[in-house]
Regions:
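Single conserved hydrophobic/aromatic residue that forms the stacking wall/gate
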Residues: 1-8, 12-13
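A conditional alpha-helix N-cap/helix-loop micro-motif detector
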Residues: 16-17, 69
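A metal-dependent, Asp-based hydrolase signature
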Residues: 9, 18-30
C-alpha cells in the first residue's frame, strides 16, 4: 500500500537544502505524487519549482486570489485536486508552526523537518510530533 506524499515545506523558496532533491527524486521514482504549497506568490512558487524541481514536483501552489493562505487547508486541497489524490493518502511535510497547523487543518499527518525555518523545541511547542533530522529520514518515515 503506497502512501502518497504532499510536500508542504517552503524548502525550495530560498534554495533547495542539501539532500532534498535526491530524496524528492527517490520518492517520485517510488510512485509518490509531490506538491509544494507556499504562502509566497503563486507565479514565484511555480517558477522556483521549475528551476529547482523540474520534472520532480507535479504541483506547485502559491498565494493567489480565491485560495486562502496557510494555515487554512485550501492550498492543500487545491494541490491534492491537481494531483488527483485523496487526503487520506497524503502526508504534509514542513518546517514551521504554520505548516504544523496547516497539516492539522487539512486532516493530514505532518513530518516537521529540522533543517528549515524553526528548531525542534519551537515545533514541539506548536504541536509537532514527527521529525526528520535529514532529508533521508522522510523516506524512512514514509516506509514505516
Amino acid at each position: 500500500e503506497m502512501l502518497r506524499s504532499l510536500v508542504g515545506s517552503e524548502m525550495c523558496i530560498r534554495d533547495s537544502y542539501d539532500g532534498v532533491v535526491p530524496v524528492l527524486r527517490k520518492l517520485k521514482e517510488k510512485g509518490y505524487a509531490l506538491a509544494i504549497v507556499s504562502n509566497k506568490i503563486d507565479f514565484a512558487v511555480k517558477e522556483l519549482n521549475e528551476i529547482y524541481f523540474e520534472g520532480i514536483v507535479q504541483a506547485a501552489i502559491g498565494e493567489r486570489e480565491g485560495v486562502a493562505r496557510k494555515p487554512a487547508p485550501d492550498m492543500v486541497h487545491t494541490a491534492l485536486a491537481e494531483l488527483g489524490k485523496p487526503a487520506d493518502t497524503a502526508v504534509y511535510i514542513g518546517d514551521s508552526d504554520v505548516d504544523v497547523m496547516t497539516a492539522k487543518n487539512s486532516g493530514l499527518p505532518c513530518i516537521s523537518v529540522l533543517w528549515g525555518f524553526r528548531d525542534k523545541e519551537f515545533l514541539i511547542e506548536h504541536g509537532a510530533t514527527n521529525f526528520a533530522e535529514k532529508p533521508e529520514d522522510i523516506v524512512k518515515f514514509l516506509e514505516q
